[in-house]
Amino acid sequence: MTPEHVTERKALVLLKFGSSAWNRWRDENPDIMIALDGVNLDGMILTGVNFAHVSLRNASLHATNLMNADLRSADFTGANLTEADLIAANLEGAILRGATLREADLLGANLTSAQYAEEDLRGALHAPVPRRTAL
């Protein structure tokens, strides 16, 4: 049996109803795989949204409010998160390779085990300071 996938169109309709409607649908459909690769979510208010394990490769989330969002293991490869509000977002295990986070606010965000290079966070507000080993 192959896992079900949600269509991009259905996902976007659900998101227009807000985070609560989206999260309720996710709770009712935990086995459905979600790929929102290349979608435009610019400026949307998605506070507290559950995007855990969602593929958002090359998506545009410019100035999107993702405060307190569950973004665990989400794939943001090549995504545009410029000026995104990621305050207190859970990005544990998220893939941020090649993502643009210029002026994104990461205050209190959990980046434990997130996959990124220093340049991916360049220009982000409240970005974690990379740890350097002493010589």
Model segments located where?
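Eukaryotic low-complexity, mixed-charge intrinsically disordered interaction/regulatory segments enriched
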Residues: 2-11
